[in-house]
């Protein structure tokens, strides 16, 4: 029993038999400890159990915990490959007691495992205890039979563990093995303790106190146990090798790399092979746990790890991407213990291949430039910081790779000069920001961004997380605190809240901490990756540096996800129905509805909208998974992904795919593939239902589509159904007969309106004049004259009426004045052809308009029309025309 997988199983099985719950490893991205970049110990997932904030169904647990130490204060990255024991990824085996057994039982369990199960020799072992922990020393004597010289008392913090400035804490006891005189080093506490002869492999933490203040420490009512054993170190001990890289798991990974390169490791290349093997593990597990390479936060640390491995692959002669080819070997070694590695194998492979393909150009160019910049330098010299910064800023060559490349030549880098060059660039960027026309209040976010860095977004995987408040902004200025009722903007180191972008509205919810809560009404993105939570302090006083819990409004986020995913389906359906010229010109994804604007130069017919809706719902009922991948822009577009108008994309993009096409060229292919950074449903069925409710024009060649999903769509259909049933009840018919009945009524109305128009025409021509107006045709100034005020005749029907009047007169002048519901008048004057030489209809209609309180009018000499605000002056208008005829 000495293989890594066998050692892990033996450890977990041993503690299972001893009444411990075997708990799966938590993800590498901690959800309940915002102070950590990555999970780096087994106790991280039990933090709230130890502090009493969380209850579990068990009081004893054991785990094999995935851990990463790279970035932040826990950073082994630069040492990996050059020492026998440093790793960025390692497995921490541990057993835990939550107020169950304590010091004596913990020591007994550990001793029995390492001597009886693992078979370690007592005379090779020794332990350390905290210098005042006589109790632990006594138990080691009792259980292991150690003499005082095998129990070393340590007075430093190495043997006293604390969760923080306050909280649970207690002494430690570490177990060491003596690897023999052939290895340099001394026992713990000696001047030579940093050597490798005495190797610590298990740390037992006895949580028996609570640090109340800096000065006050009290006993815990229920002391607990937290232990951690490095699996890789234990494997090196049991397999009798000097380095963790010589254990079976690492040998297999190094063999896979050697086979792919066609080159066996030797003294000159062994460090590079070790770097590749270790970094393959950390990169793969981080990607499998949802971290993707980026230029900020965890993603940046992942990118550094990947690129450091890729640099060493290049040193070994790799002329094409190597890392992705090694993923199957890693899955064979560790996939059974960690199923998430199996599930994420494709994503891990694609991510590694993409990153290495993109980075090779940077690497080759950067190494060439570095060679030129250092051709006059020798061992012991220093590369100036300005040149190192230029390599980083202009050519994308990271500082740590510059240092790593020069390390082999014993050349250092002027880090102070590098930092100074970076600060100068920031000052220039800030000056440019201030002069860019942004509102003065917006510049505060640039300052905050400089101090805090970008916000880590967790919202693709979770709607709840913990964080630390890094900045508070009130009235456009940073403040240290804000009280109840204050409107405040909050910046946290990591957040599940989505910041408004890509048309999707920002999240709302609650941010709370000890003694305070903030109601978040919006989340926005500011200043290059800074997420700003806008809200009002609902209770207490909030201060910068406070630990907080962030909870997104789940119901609202659910509706936003459904609406955003529906825009993708509708967009693709529109392209299929209307043509590939359709492109999105803008969008709004709100919780209540969605709308987006598309390029299309004519109204969309009802039949076309019905087909769009049908096709979108066809994908909804598939309930197919919605997948996301990280790709280069060029690769994404080459695969058919749609890039949206007006959006800015970085070198890497998130590609969202959903549905399977059923018809034509899309058959059996992904239905919708778009570049998108928004939040989406897990499966298309989560959308529920898509209902297109309107199509309108917003600009030349641009149509606006509005739609509803899920419950909103169902309510819309319910309301339409209620209205249909109400109409049917009014008509005293069944709902199915309503369309035919309405069509018949419309035809009947059309006929009645036509009959009414004819009746009004006859009435106007045959009599019924208003009081004071002539009832028969007259002669004025020697010509025939017909003038009447008519009601119920629309302005557009006055001209046909005037034509009929001319025909009735044969020769003469006709005037008709109509009125609308607002008592505004319309007037038409017509002159028969034989009289247009004497009278102009345009001149006469202007006279009539003036009498009605209007002015102007226009038309032809034989027919003109005008209006006026006062229809009660209709008879005055007719009289004015008669007077004009007499005066002519």
Curated annotation (Swiss-Prot):
PROSITE patterns the record matches: AA_TRNA_LIGASE_II_ALA
Q: Which cofactor does it need?
A: Zn(2+)
SUPFAM superfamilies referenced in this protein's UniProt entry, alphabetically: Class II aaRS and biotin synthetases, Putative anticodon-binding domain of alanyl-tRNA synthetase (AlaRS), ThrRS/AlaRS common domain, Translation proteins
Question: What are this entry's molecular-function GO terms?
Answer: alanine-tRNA ligase activity; aminoacyl-tRNA deacylase activity; ATP binding; tRNA binding; zinc ion binding
Q: Where in the cell is it found?
A: Cytoplasm
Residues annotated for Zn(2+) binding in this entry: 564, 568, 676, 680
Record remark on domains: Consists of three domains; the N-terminal catalytic domain, the editing domain and the C-terminal C-Ala domain. The editing domain removes incorrectly charged amino acids, while the C-Ala domain, along with tRNA(Ala), serves as a bridge to cooperatively bring together the editing and aminoacylation centers thus stimulating deacylation of misacylated tRNAs.
User: What family, per the record?
Assistant: Belongs to the class-II aminoacyl-tRNA synthetase family.
What is this protein identified as? Alanine--tRNA ligase
The protein's organism comes out as Mesorhizobium japonicum (strain LMG 29417 / CECT 9101 / MAFF 303099) (Mesorhizobium loti (strain MAFF 303099))
> Its encoding gene is what?
alaS
